[in-house]
């Protein structure tokens, strides 16, 4: 977030955590919050949704920007269902609607996220612009400047801060 601060989030099948300059200590993600983080990660990146969601159902067809798109309903565990629109020709995820359960507020926050500016990166379609909007924080825009493969990271970046 540049001069406004930073957030580090790591999620695996078994654990997850968030650390930021806003909170004095890291926050472990457990139960539904860990599942929710895994779902959000799967929607942001290209993953096999059938490995993440309990059900994925086509519920309709719509036209977006003169293109045919399938409307999907997805569920996992006890989380609220997610509605998504997928381009029928390219398979690009155009947008999704989900209620994000905030661990601090304890209430679901309806959120709509659009994915735009898809580009091919070594055979994988990647959205280089992601726009998320909700009533509490307004609109957040994520833009990818560069997408690289085979980047080496210090493995400690992915450990929970208390486990270093």
Predicted features along the sequence, with ranges:
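Generic beta-strand structural signal
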Residues: 7, 14, 54, 68-70, ...
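Gly/Pro-enriched, hydrophobic low-complexity segments
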Residues: 65-161
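Short linear motifs in intrinsically disordered
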Residues: 6-9, 59-63, 119-123
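Short, conserved active-site entrance elements at the starts or edges of catalytic domains
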Residues: 35-71, 93-97
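N-terminal cleavable signal peptides for secretion/export
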Residues: 3, 161-164
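An acidic-aromatic
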Residues: 1-39
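Short N-terminal helix-initiation segments at or just after the protein's N-terminus
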Residues: 12-20, 34, 60-62, 74, ...
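Short, solvent-exposed secondary-structure boundary motifs
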Residues: 1-3, 43-54, 73-77, 104-109
């Amino acid at each position: 977030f540049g001069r406004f601060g930073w957030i580090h989030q790591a999620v695996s099948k078994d654990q997850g955590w968030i650390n930021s300059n806003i909170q004095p200590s890291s926050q472990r993600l457990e139960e539904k919050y860990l599942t929710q983080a895994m779902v959000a990660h799967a929607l942001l990146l290209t993953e096999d949704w059938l490995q993440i969601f309990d059900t994925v159902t086509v519920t309709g067809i719509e036209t977006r920007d003169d293109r045919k798109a399938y409307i999907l309903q997805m569920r996992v565990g006890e989380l609220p269902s997610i509605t998504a629109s997928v381009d029928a020709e390219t398979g690009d995820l155009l947008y999704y609607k989900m209620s994000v359960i905030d661990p601090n507020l304890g209430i679901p926050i309806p959120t709509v996220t659009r994915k735009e500016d898809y580009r091919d990166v070594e055979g994988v379609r990647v959205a280089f612009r992601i726009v998320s909007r909700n009533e509490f924080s307004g609109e957040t825009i994520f833009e990818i400047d560069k997408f690289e493969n085979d980047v080496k990271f210090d493995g400690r970046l992915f450990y929970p801060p208390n486990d270093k």
